[in-house]
């Protein structure tokens, strides 16, 4: 039986959208889909090949991010005016950052957070690295984990077709909780092990079709191709997730 942790926050506390000092990211996906390596790469740990036979439990990590880092991340791509080639889809999804999600970032970092930025200088980012979810039923613990999340990263292994297919079940469960709790929790899809070109079984075209059918778009920073081993797009992935959290919280505050 697998053991899964929760963030430990009380659901009776203030709504997550009013927490301006922390962001909670849950990383989900099949076992051995590269979740742990992705998280540890972002935390600055050295890359290690996972032992497929090793039993593991869910882990909760912390990392402090300066709020200015998010502002600089936005301004970098705003000034360049180009969407980074995160997914190998640049030719099909070319355009400026303003064309694809300009209002999305502009409102968040310039308008919505103008006063917020003056009150805080850093964000405590809590990353919850889960083990494989039981998709056959929705447990109370799984519901709690999703409800406590500010955003969810769904990982699949570019060399394992079944890990991509599993995402549909994960997304259905997350959407169910989102509707039930009336929460707009951002979901970002991450393809791991993109450095293993010779072993890759999932083509860019297949990924694009799959994520578009589920309502996701690389142009909206919904999808990233990553390599934990060579630290490809890892930092960009997590910064984009944090930007999405800022917007989600801002939108939620306006409704309350």
UniProtKB/Swiss-Prot annotation:
One of its GO terms (biological process) is intracellular protein transport. Coiled coil: none annotated. One of its GO terms (molecular function) is GTP binding. It comes from the Eukaryota. InterPro entries: P-loop_NTPase, Small_GTPase. ATP binds at residues 29-36. SMART domains: RAB, RAS. Keywords: ATP-binding, Nucleotide-binding. One of its GO terms (cellular component) is endomembrane system. This is Uncharacterized protein YHR022C. It holds the Pfam family Ras. PANTHER family: PTHR47978. PROSITE patterns: RAB. It comes from Saccharomyces cerevisiae (strain ATCC 204508 / S288c) (Baker's yeast). The keyword ATP-binding applies.
